[in-house]
UniProtKB/Swiss-Prot annotation:
<feature type="active site" description="For beta-ketoacyl synthase activity">
    <location>
        <position position="309"/>
    </location>
</feature>
<feature type="active site" description="For beta-ketoacyl synthase activity">
    <location>
        <position position="169"/>
    </location>
</feature>
<dbReference type="GO" id="GO:0004315">
    <property type="term" value="F:3-oxoacyl-[acyl-carrier-protein] synthase activity"/>
</dbReference>
<dbReference type="InterPro" id="IPR020841">
    <property type="entry name" value="PKS_Beta-ketoAc_synthase_dom"/>
</dbReference>
<dbReference type="InterPro" id="IPR000794">
    <property type="entry name" value="Beta-ketoacyl_synthase"/>
</dbReference>
<keyword id="KW-0808">Transferase</keyword>
<dbReference type="Pfam" id="PF02801">
    <property type="entry name" value="Ketoacyl-synt_C"/>
</dbReference>
<dbReference type="Pfam" id="PF00109">
    <property type="entry name" value="ketoacyl-synt"/>
</dbReference>
<dbReference type="GO" id="GO:0005829">
    <property type="term" value="C:cytosol"/>
</dbReference>
<feature type="active site" description="For beta-ketoacyl synthase activity">
    <location>
        <position position="346"/>
    </location>
</feature>
<dbReference type="InterPro" id="IPR016039">
    <property type="entry name" value="Thiolase-like"/>
</dbReference>
<dbReference type="InterPro" id="IPR014031">
    <property type="entry name" value="Ketoacyl_synth_C"/>
</dbReference>
<dbReference type="GO" id="GO:0006633">
    <property type="term" value="P:fatty acid biosynthetic process"/>
</dbReference>
<comment type="function">
    <text>Involved in developmentally regulated synthesis of a compound biosynthetically related to polyketide antibiotics which is essential for spore color in Streptomyces halstedii.</text>
</comment>
<dbReference type="InterPro" id="IPR018201">
    <property type="entry name" value="Ketoacyl_synth_AS"/>
</dbReference>
<keyword id="KW-0012">Acyltransferase</keyword>
<feature type="domain" description="Ketosynthase family 3 (KS3)">
    <location>
        <begin position="2"/>
        <end position="416"/>
    </location>
</feature>
Amino acid sequence: MSRRVVVTGIGVVAPGGIGAARFWDLLAGGRTATRRISLFDPARLRSQIAAECDFDPSAHGLDDETVRRCDRYVQFALVATAEAVRDAGLDTTREDPWRMGAVLGTAVGGTTRLEHDYVLVSEGGSRWDVDHRRAEPHLHRAFAPSTLASTVAETFGAQGPVQTVSTGCTSGLDAVGYAYHAIAEGRADVCLAGASDSPISPITMACFDAIKATSPSNDDPEHASRPFDARRNGFVMGEGGAVLVLEELEHARARGADVYCELAGYATFGNAHHMTGLTREGLEMARAIDTALDMARLDGTDIDYVNAHGSGTQQNDRHETAAVKRSLGEHAYRTPMSSIKSMVGHSLGAIGSIEVVACVLALAHQVVPPTANYETPDPECDLDYVPREARERELRSVLSVGSGFGGFQSAVVLTGPERRLR
């Protein structure tokens, strides 16, 4: 693939920071956005905490009709895409619509709207013979995962590759990766790529409660998410969305766009092992890392920072540490590796794209965001996890990795423009 892909715009809706500037302030300051859930009464849940977005759709330009027909996760994506397009200085009306794509990821789609409408049509969940007359006319559009990509495409005029990606917690990374391939292989010149999820709802929270994946530290929410720490006890649910404008390099140059960085490599593999279990050796994640590095024509020793999946579960953090050491060798011990989930929670399908935006900003600022709440070392997690405080560092190439229920293992490599765009 000879066509090179660059990032020219970013947009983000995240807990504690809507807009790239506020999002970066949160990360650089090492602050956490976890609080007791306010979107519904969580009293009957094991985990009653989450990282919510302080989100008013009308304050971000969404009209009443859009709010009625779109679930919260689609609203996040529309706001993030609008910011990314503005940031890129991209006039979508002047682009060839057949050469502009929209690839968006989600893990749970419109679960919140589906829950809400089920209560309406079933007399509060008491009847199976539902009353269809009570269903909202926008229900299908609101909950169907396909709506995410189609709504962004419709709003911004993209008629090229339009796709919703749903690969669990790697959906955001994979959406960015699939958009990368669409441009690199010549099927598009521009792609709006990212992901969005709003999983802080009773049924989704209950799903993760049932398998004890989420943290029960309800009495100390700000310190509940502690990836790689020996006392970690599960992840904190989050929500949000992030979108990047990806362009073919010469297309970006022709319109005089500023370039953040190059998306230089991407790979994804499955472990064919278990729905939630991970192999201790991290072979599949290591293979994704190695393949993404090969695509970027880089070696493990070229990586200056690893943005970890770092969910804060016991098995994930061991698995990921092993994978990074397998791929980077001794260089892993000299490479900072941090998890922003410690600050913004785990927004399932959205987090991969949110983390890619964090990597873009890390390259732009030459700063590594910290792992908040990391205090007690785990002998099996023995790398440099950037405890509690951001760190200035020369960054030229960064790696972002993700792991998803179902065995998905993905990796993206980003390089600063001064390294490769001469």
